[in-house]
Curated annotation (Swiss-Prot):
Residue ranges annotated for the Lipoyl-binding domain, each copy included: 70-144
Top EC group: transferase
Biological classification of the source: Eukaryota, Metazoa, Chordata, Craniata, Vertebrata
Entry GO terms, CC: cytosol; membrane; mitochondrial matrix; mitochondrion; nucleoplasm; nucleus; oxoadipate dehydrogenase complex; oxoglutarate dehydrogenase complex
One annotated GO biological process: generation of precursor metabolites and energy
Pfam families per UniProt: 2-oxoacid_dh (PF00198), Biotin_lipoyl (PF00364)
Organism: Homo sapiens
Keyword Nucleus: yes
Protein name in UniProt: Dihydrolipoyllysine-residue succinyltransferase component of 2-oxoglutarate dehydrogenase complex, mitochondrial
Length: 453
């Protein structure tokens, strides 16, 4: 064993000497991962001493693309009121994406945030599973950049027309008819004697089995779907409102005759000047701001931590908008300084963003009062639930012709029921009823707003 080790050592020494002198055919070429002691040192290298000869063995990795071409995309920063969200992937590993193309969507408590691709490239890896929870700054996916945008697929060329079938050159000649027999053929003698039982010409058939009761009807089934984060948050907030607030609702009805007449008379001029349609929501938003200035307690809120009442000198009205994902409430800020055109423009912009699922969290943060319009769905009557941490909410309903007493006579007028749900811990019945009557007066006669009555 000892002699064998010495032989191996001598053979290795001779090879090493030949390598150092250049006699080895590989001595003049650089070997990957191996360098002589005269070469520079590397942080990932280690030195090996064999027969007083020092070698440096370097371990490394190589890649075909520069590191700068591989980008890690992280979760965008959330607002202070949002801590995490659920990821829903729109692309998979290996998909080619263009710059600003949506790769995934992060669903938070309030809205959905779309994460676009920062450049043209190919998805290398998805770092979070579908449905996984992420926080702000969490790595989402890696993208390998490419030079140009992905080419659109060319439309498939129409297949070549099939060659027309060859038409028959001549009609087929029918075969000659067989001769008609003039005599009946002889009756064959039976090989077995006939039995005494008659033979039926029709084979007996078995009646089909009777169908089970209810088999022809549709099958009864059920399926389950996980609640999305927005629906969970809505359920949580509404239950918090019921458990925290002492909610009470007061009602009134509004004659919509004058506001309908004003809209019909000025909608064309309004559209021509502002390029906006004149609706009823702007009238209720403006009337609510007018009433909130008269009754500031409705615009206030209780701070349960410090047991204080917070009065706001600004009016930010949240307008409820129904989307396929759930109810969202974007905020119209500083309504007290707006006119009808400003309100209509803001409502149009927020509604368009809500339908396209482009609302940012900043669009829904805050709000001192909420208006919910169930009338667009044909609602006749209802009691809305407060949107915490606010103290009141106005519920609008449908406009229906009803007989009402006007000056001692019965007339048919377009009427709307309105409901005000408020936190009775802070707002007394007198303030709530006065507030709702202010809205009624401003909508029934818009001149009240002009004259500040």
């Amino acid at each position: 064993m000892l002699s064998r080790s010495r032989c191996v050592s001598r053979a290795f020494s001779r090879s090493l000497s030949a390598f150092q002198k250049g006699n080895c055919p590989l001595g003049r070429r650089s070997l990957p991962g191996v360098s002589l002691c005269q070469g520079p040192g590397y942080p990932n290298s280690r030195k090996v001493v064999i027969n007083n000869s020092v070698f440096s063995v370097r371990f490394f990795r190589t890649t075909a693309v520069c590191k700068d071409d591989l980008v890690t995309v992280k979760t965008p920063a959330f607002a202070e009121s949002v801590t995490e969200g659920d990821v829903r992937w729109e692309k998979a590993v290996g998909d080619t994406v263009a710059e600003d193309e949506v790769v995934c969507e992060i669903e938070t408590d309030k809205t959905s945030v779309q994460v676009p691709s920062p450049a043209n490239g190919v998805i290398e890896a998805l770092l979070v599973p579908d449905g996984g929870k992420v926080e702000g700054g969490t790595p989402l996916f890696t993208l390998r950049k490419t030079g140009a945008a992905p080419a659109k697929a060319k439309p498939a060329e129409a297949p070549a027309a099939a060659a027309p079938k060859a038409e028959p050159t001549a009609a087929a000649v029918p075969p000659p008819a067989a001769p008609i027999p003039t005599q009946m053929p002889p009756v064959p003698s039976p090989s077995q004697p006939p039995s005494g039982k008659p033979v039926s010409a029709v084979k007996p058939t078995v009646a089909p089995p009777l169908a089970e009761p209810g088999a022809g009807k549709g099958l009864r089934s059920e399926h389950r779907e996980k609640m999305n984060r927005m629906r969970q948050r809505i359920a949580q907030r509404l239950k918090e409102a019921q458990n925290t607030c002492a909610m009470l609702t007061t009602f009134n009805e509004i004659d919509m005759s004058n506001i309908q007449e004003m809209r019909a008379r000025h909608k064309e001029a309004f559209l021509k000047k502002h390029n906006l349609k004149l609706g009823f929501m702007s009238a209720f938003v403006k009337a609510s701001a007018f009433a909130l200035q008269e009754q500031p307690v409705v615009n206030a809120v209780i701070d349960d931590t410090t047991k204080e009442v917070v009065y706001r000198d600004y009016i930010d009205i949240s307008v409820a908008v129904a989307t396929p994902r759930g109810l969202v409430v974007p905020v119209i800020r500083n309504v007290e300084a707006m006119n009808f055109a400003d309100i209509e423009r803001t409502i149009t912009e927020l509604g368009e963003k809500a339908r396209k699922n482009e609302l940012a969290i900043e669009d829904m943060d805050g709000g001192t009062f909420t208006i919910s319009n169930g009338g667009v769905f044909g609602s006749l009557f209802g009691t809305p639930i407060i949107n915490p941490p606010q103290s009141a909410i106005l519920g609008m309903h449908g406009i229906f012709d009803r007989p009402v007493a006007i000056g001692g006579k019965v007339e048919v007028r377009p009427m709307m029921y309105v409901a005000l749900t408020y936190d009775h811990r802070l707002i007394d019945g007198r303030e709530a009823v006065t507030f709702l009557r202010k809205i009624k007066a401003a909508v029934e006669d818009p001149r009240v707003l002009l004259l500040d009555l």
